[in-house]
């Protein structure tokens, strides 16, 4: 279920063939919130790493703060840095490319070290 407030006004009203679409900012905010709330889902970490090709970590944090105003943004860094509880046995379906955890982990660490930067797509 989508949070009723969109980071970018009007984006949750975008319908294509009856499917409601959220902006990348809204998706990033929801993914960060998911990692903070339950840091066990591998998919959330992978999605955040893949989003870094389109949004900087600063933009993701800004989107998170706009969508979830009561949350402390410093928790994001802590949650993204804690990999010990991720369920690596969870089935993961990647549409484009091949998933490699070491690449995802490296990207997340790069995002934290260089928040204003966007990164090239995974190869």
Residue ranges and their predicted role:
Residues 1-123:
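Compositionally biased terminal segments of proteins
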